[in-house]
């Protein structure tokens, strides 16, 4: 029987969690309170969408200062080369600027986000906007939705609530 996952939050962390879960064979639904998903990602793209730096692991970790060792396991699993590879896997060419920052050639977020949504759709991920998470209730998740209150049962819940 296929496991189900609810990802609450449609920003980059939630979308990445949805992608990884779907690739692992989990049936995923992403819920977001806003009218559309990826809104902060689009805002970040207004300044060119610096996606990573073209640096090795140790140089990347230096950016985390006193927290570099705490971040090492995560950054090691998804380092600069993997971030660049992920963007390229969405058929989005990249370039490396003089500061070693890496950008999509389009210099904006919308083409990358559209390609990401297309991939999620191909993986069977369902994305629901205007579903505001309210509470956990008896093993279910309570949402306020455009059609009124809804309760969702799921095997796994990922909270990707952003900041």
What are the residue ranges of the model-derived segments?
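N-terminal Rossmann-like FAD-binding beta1-loop-alpha1 element of flavoenzymes
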Residues: 3-30
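Fold-independent oxyanion-binding glycine-rich loops
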Residues: 10-11, 32-34, 45-46, 53-54, ...
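Glycine-rich FAD pyrophosphate-binding loop
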Residues: 22-46
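Short phosphate-binding/catalytic loops that engage adenosine nucleotides
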Residues: 26, 92, 125
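Glycine-rich active-site loop/strand segments that organize a redox cofactor
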Residues: 46-96
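Helix-loop-beta segment of a Rossmann-like dinucleotide-binding subdomain
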Residues: 66-71, 88-114, 154-156, 160-162
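Predominantly flavin-linked oxidoreductase catalytic cores and closely associated redox partners
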Residues: 110-111, 116-163
